[in-house]
Every structure is written in C-alpha cells, then in structure tokens.
C-alpha cells in the first residue's frame, strides 16, 4: 500500500475536518399500519427501538476503531402519511410523538419521515399530515418532516405548493427550529441519509443503512496544491480526493450493516459543510479562483465541483445514491454566511447555483413579513428547476426577523443572515392551484 496515501488519509481526519456526517438507518413502517392510531403509534415505537436500538453504540464503536468522527446516527422511516391514512384520525401528531419517543430512547438526534408524497395530488393521509405538521413539529424535538410536491414524471402539484407556503408561514410564528426541520422537495429520493429531508422509500428493503460523508476541507486542501493549474488538473484533483472520501464512507457503511445485521444501502456522495472554519463548500469554490462566492463564475465552479465529486465517488462505492453532490446551505457554511453578509451573494444567485448542485435553497432566513404566497412561489421556482432538469431540488427556508439581522441556531445549523426577498407579489399566480404538467421530455415509455 502506498505510504503517501496513508499519510494523506491521516491528514484528512486529523487536520482537514473530514468526518462521516451520518449513518442513517432506514426502517419500513408498512407492517405497523393499524386502523387504531394509538396502536399504530405503539407499533412504530417498538419497531424503531427494536431495529435501531444499537445504532448509536455500533456507530461509536466503528468511529473509535477507525479513528474517524461519526457525527450523527439517525433514522428515517416510511412517509407517515401512508401509515396514518389507514386510521380514522384527523391529526397524526400521536405518530410523530411515537417517533420522537423512540428517537430519545435509542439516543439519536433526528428521525426523518414525517412526510407526504403529493407530486400528483393528495390522498387522504397527505392533507391531514400537512395540516398537522405545525402541531406535530412543535410537540416534538427530534422529528423532521418533508413533502415532495413535484417530479419530472408528474409535474408540480401547485395546490400542495400553495399549502406548503401557508404551512411554513404558520410555523414561522413559533420556534425558529420548526422550519429548520421541514424540507419541501421536487424529485425527492428514497434513500437520502441527510436530515431534514430523509425518509425511507416504499421501494426500499425493510431495514437499510445509508451513509453520508463530509469533506469540503479535504477538497480545499487538495486544491491549494494545484493553484494556477488548468481546469483539467482541477477536475482530476477533485475526483481523486472524492474517491478517498467516499472509500471511507463505503467502509463505515459496510461495517455498520454487518454489525447491525442490516442490508447496506448507499453512500451519498454529497460534500456537506459545517459552520466550522475549514469545512466550507464556499471556500472550495473560492479556492478555484473566485474572489468571493456569488460573483460571476460561481455557478460554473459549482457545476464542475459537483460533477467531479460524483465521478470520483462513484468508483469508490459499491452503490451510490441519496442527493450526491455539493450542499450549499447558507447558515451551515461559514463561507456562504460571509458572502451574504458582504452583499456578494443573494437569493437569486443561490437559485442559479441550485440548477447545478444537489439540493436547493437550504437553511436560508428571509424576513418574517414575507407573505405565504411569496414563500410558495420560491418553492415553485425550485420545483421547476428540479422537474425540468430531472434532478432533486428543495427548499428549507426560515421566515424570521428583519432583513440584515442574524438568526442564531448554533451547532451544525450555524447562523442565518436574513436575506432580501423580492417584494413584488406572486399571489395571483399561486392562488390558481392545480397541476403544472410534466415536461415533454419526461414522456419516455
């Protein structure tokens, strides 16, 4: 084995903020369906505790053995709207409480799956879940929610988009954490290990392990060694670095699945930043030659980074999936926060960047007076980007405070500067409701 590769791997862990961001166990709750919501809640609690009871212990063991920090151990479950639909209940909060109780029992920080898939319309459980979302998220500490409002095959459910704008607005009157735990998707994936948007798809195995890695600091350090070189060398350097990062994720996932006796799912190839210095996707883009993120060239730099990460990572993992690419959350990235505060980065540029990367408008604070119709229109724009380009896009926004203020979350969630939003109205557009049809290129059969 090449000694230089060993040295580089040690440096990744000790000096460059490399870590495994999450080991996420996906658990099917289809066998927990019951006409009695209280019985369903108890079944949900029991299954999560039985399946994931040793998840934290095993994750800590593996981290200690390999000398790698495994930051989060998490669980995702079948979209709760599917489970709740079998009951006569008009509020699914008891199911969220069961999830929360199980999460506390097994010692995980978040559990995802208080979710609904409504890309082509509402079923009985979907509307109930969305209406109960403000109450359910307020009543729980660790439950995360998501709603898929569009897909390339189905188009965009604009009625659901309107409803989600109103839901986010309602939740903004409560704790700042409520909207930090809600993601609105287009083309949501079934094997996402990252919160808050993780849920366990109905096409997945009963129980699986998915892994998400984090390595912006490692990529930046590698690029520092090729300053001034051509884009060809830049891309090759990112690919080689992504291979090393993903290889460790593959190893951790295999070890976890063997010890928990659970099928191994995927490694998510995403570069996930944190607010820590040296762990920023924005600083990687600036290392490519941009004075600051948000200037002209930012979208091209991000596109190349995203593509090179995928090309390098796909060779290192048995199976890849999830969101896979570079995350650009504002509050969770020290470089993004700095760019917003300097005036170099605005929501319009962030929207352009989402055309070429993994997710969307993520962890962005907007003024609290922003109307629900404007929030819905922002969701519609992101959904359109995803649907037309056959990729996952999402919105996680926090209406709070006044433009220019800083919303302090702390920990991995960081600080969100309140960003300017276009004040022109989209109300009549959003009021239409109905369905934006699927694009012509979605028709492939």
Curated annotation (Swiss-Prot):
<protein>
    <recommendedName>
        <fullName>UPF0210 protein LACR_1020</fullName>
    </recommendedName>
</protein>
<dbReference type="Pfam" id="PF05167">
    <property type="entry name" value="DUF711"/>
</dbReference>
<dbReference type="InterPro" id="IPR007841">
    <property type="entry name" value="UPF0210"/>
</dbReference>
<comment type="similarity">
    <text>Belongs to the UPF0210 family.</text>
</comment>
<comment type="subunit">
    <text>Homodimer.</text>
</comment>
């Amino acid at each position: 084995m090449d000694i230089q590769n060993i040295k580089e791997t040690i440096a990744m862990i000790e000096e460059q903020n490399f870590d495994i961001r999450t080991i996420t166990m996906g658990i099917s709750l289809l066998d927990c369906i019951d006409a009695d919501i209280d019985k369903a809640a108890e079944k949900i609690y029991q299954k999560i505790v039985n399946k994931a009871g040793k998840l934290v212990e095993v994750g800590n063991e593996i981290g200690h053995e390999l000398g790698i920090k495994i930051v989060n151990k998490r669980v995702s479950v079948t979209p709760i709207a599917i489970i709740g639909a079998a009951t006569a209940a008009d509020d699914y909060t008891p199911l969220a409480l069961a999830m929360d109780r199980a999460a506390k029992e097994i010692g995980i920080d978040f559990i995802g799956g208080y979710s609904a898939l409504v890309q082509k319309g509402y079923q009985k459980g979907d509307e109930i879940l969305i209406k109960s979302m403000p109450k359910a998220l307020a009543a729980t500490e660790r439950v995360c929610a998501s709603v898929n409002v569009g897909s390339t095959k189905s188009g965009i459910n604009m009625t659901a988009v309107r409803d989600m704008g109103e839901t986010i607005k309602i939740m903004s009157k409560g704790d700042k954490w409520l909207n930090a735990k809600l993601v609105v998707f287009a083309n949501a994936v079934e094997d996402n290990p990252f919160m808050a948007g993780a849920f366990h798809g109905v096409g997945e195995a009963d129980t699986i392990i998915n892994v998400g890695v984090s390595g912006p600091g490692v990529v930046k350090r590698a690029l520092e060694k090729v300053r001034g070189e051509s884009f060809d060398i830049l891309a090759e350097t990112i690919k080689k670095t992504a291979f090393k990062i993903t290889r460790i994720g593959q190893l951790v996932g295999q070890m976890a699945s063997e010890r928990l006796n659970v099928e191994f799912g995927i490694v998510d190839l995403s570069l996930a930043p944190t607010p820590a210095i040296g762990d920023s996707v924005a600083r990687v883009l600036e290392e490519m030659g941009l004075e600051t993120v948000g200037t002209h060239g930012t979208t091209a730099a991000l596109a190349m980074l995203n593509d090179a990460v995928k090309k390098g990572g796909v060779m290192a993992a048995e199976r890849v999936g999830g969101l896979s690419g570079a995350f650009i959350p504002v509050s969770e990235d020290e470089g993004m926060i700095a760019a917003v505060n300097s005036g170099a980065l605005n929501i319009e540029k962030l929207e352009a960047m989402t055309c070429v990367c993994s997710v969307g408008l993520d962890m962005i604070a907007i003024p609290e007076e922003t109307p629900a119709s404007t929030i819905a229109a922002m969701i519609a724009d992101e959904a359109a980007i995803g649907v037309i380009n056959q990729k996952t896009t999402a919105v996680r926004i926090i209406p709070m405070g006044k433009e220019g203020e800083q919303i302090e979350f702390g920990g991995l969630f960081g600080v969100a500067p309140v960003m300017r939003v276009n004040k022109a109205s989209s109300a009549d557009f959003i009021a239409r409701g109905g369905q934006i049809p699927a694009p012509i290129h979605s028709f492939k059969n």
